From Swiss-Prot:
Domain of life, per lineage: Bacteria
Species assigned in the record: Chlorobium phaeovibrioides (strain DSM 265 / 1930)
NCBIfam families reported for this sequence: mnmE_trmE_thdF, small_GTP
Cofactor: K(+)
Any one GO biological process: tRNA wobble uridine modification
SUPFAM superfamilies on file: P-loop containing nucleoside triphosphate hydrolases (SSF52540), TrmE connector domain (SSF116878)
Binding-site residues, GTP: 240-245, 259-265, 284-287
Protein name (record): tRNA modification GTPase MnmE
Length: 473
């Protein structure tokens, strides 16, 4: 991976297609950087033969004309001009809107590359917006989350973060940490006078307050990440209980192979579906049983791993046969081993059960979980199951209304590290340890918070974040 400069100075001219590849009514090709106005002048002619130069054009102006390459006209286009610093990247930018055929777009982009641009790298436009100070790192990530949002809640959360709500909250906390750090470091300059510029009692209260705010953000990740990643719902149970049939029923199409032969599913299958504004990441797992067969054994091991990562377990039982007490005991054991996961017991094949009502009552009593009667192959009970699943995560679609919410694992880990540093600082304050030791922990917390907004950043971190963007964003 090539290293890219961290400096926010205007970079070389870059160009890329900003709209999805394929056939459409319109497409956009954009340029940014040093010299893009001159490059635009080389390829664009305004309609009607009017004398025109992009170097003289006002910002936020639109111009209709033709764009040509060395072989002649490529297309009629509309050119939008953005003058530095009033652009997304804070550099000079030009965007060409053309017809959306892939050949047209390819020729237009090539004309810009032949005239002096280089092809932009993934996320380079947004990267330049961050480096120039137009947005912070958290807002840059929010743009990516907004683009990839699959539910209304995920979209609204990304919009809130893009507007800077969490950034402002973190900045306020960072200002408090900086103030305490500055007072401690001032003490070091006057160490011979043995003076405290902030009493240790006041410092302990301030650090405790800031740690409490950070811990509240850490706790918000528990539900917040479900908005962007979806609810991890694992379908588990014994072989041939109907797990794959249930997966297909929930998805509304055949995704998994269904067979009467036990052990057909050797590895887990993951798919997503959306119900009542909530996205569920469904995982169909291998049947849970003892097996000496190597491949099936590995599949079962992976099943238990996915169960351990689940937010919601759908434990499916074949109610047409088997010992219900044994099945209830197995469900209880799974729930006890994974108390952080919610569980729904799905009594499948109730159309074949001799006493479905009594069996449901028994399972509800012995598992203390919601029990849904189903005939997955017929779709019976499917709507009730979906409603129960949505009810288990009730309120998730309203989480985006919170003013600040952590949805990213990167942000969660940085905040957790910051909270640990503040915990260390509190212990040092209580023990009346030297100011330099306390200041070190506060500085560590500052750095962790700074990693989120980009105040403290490395080349590797920037590459990791922006390489996930598409070219043109």
């Amino acid at each position: 991976m090539t290293e890219r400069p961290l400096t926010p100075e205007a970079g070389e001219a870059i160009a890329a297609i900003a709209t999805p590849v394929g056939v459409g009514a319109l497409a956009i090709v954009r340029m940014s950087g040093r010299g893009v106005l001159e490059i635009a002048d080389r390829v664009f002619r305004k309609k009607g033969g009017t004398a025109f130069s992009f170097k003289e054009a006002e910002g936020f102006s639109a111009h209709f004309g033709t764009l040509s390459d060395s072989r002649g006209m490529v297309d009629e286009v509309i050119a939008l001009v953005f003058r530095a610093p009033s652009s997304f990247t804070m550099e000079d930018m030009v965007e060409f809107t053309c017809h959306g055929g892939p050949v047209v777009v390819r020729h237009l982009l090539q004309a810009l590359l032949d005239s002096g641009c280089r092809l932009a790298e993934p996320g380079e436009f947004t990267r330049r917006a961050f480096l120039s100070g137009r947005i912070d790192l958290l807002q840059a990530e929010a743009i990516g989350e907004m683009i990839h949002a699959r539910t209304e809640s995920a979209f609204r959360t990304a919009v809130t973060q893009m507007q800077g709500n969490l950034s402002r909250h973190l900045q306020e906390m960072r200002a408090g940490l900086l103030q305490s750090c500055a007072l401690l470091e001032l003490e070091l300059d006057f160490s011979e006078d043995d003076v405290e510029f902030q009493s240790r009692d006041a410092l302990r209260l301030e650090v405790g307050r800031l740690q409490g705010e950070i811990l509240r953000l850490v706790e918000s990740y528990r539900e917040g990440h479900l908005l962007t990643e979806g609810v991890a719902a694992v379908i588990a149970g014994r072989p041939n209980a109907g797990k794959s049939t249930l997966l297909n029923a929930l998805l509304g199409h055949e995704r998994a192979i269904v067979s009467h032969m036990p052990g057909t599913t050797r590895d887990y299958i993951e798919e997503c579906f959306i119900h009542e504004k909530t996205m569920f990441r469904l995982t169909d797992t291998a049947g849970l049983r003892h097996s000496d067969e190597e491949v099936e054994h590995e599949g079962i091991r992976r099943s238990y791993r996915k169960i351990s990562e689940a937010d919601l377990m759908l434990y499916i039982i074949d109610s047409s046969e088997g010992d219900m007490q044994q099945e209830a005991a197995a469900a209880r054991e799974l729930r006890q081993r994974h108390p952080e996961s919610r569980m729904i017991v799905v009594a499948n094949k109730t159309d074949l059960a001799p006493d479905a009502g009594g069996m449901i009552a028994q399972l509800q009593s012995e598992t203390a979980c919601p029990v849904i009667a189903m005939a997955a192959s017929k779709g019976d009970g499917l709507n009730e199951l979906k409603s129960t699943m949505a009810g288990m995560v009730e309120g998730l679609d309203k989480l985006h209304e919170a003013s600040v919410l952590v949805t990213s694992l990167r942000h969660y880990e940085a905040l957790r590290n910051a909270a640990d540093s503040l915990d260390n600082a509190l212990q040092l304050i209580t023990a009346r340890e030297p100011a330099e030791l306390i200041a070190f922990e506060l500085r560590s917390a500052l750095d962790y918070v700074g990693e989120i907004t980009g105040k403290v950043v490395s080349q590797e971190l920037l590459n990791t974040i922006f390489d996930q963007f598409c070219i043109g964003k």
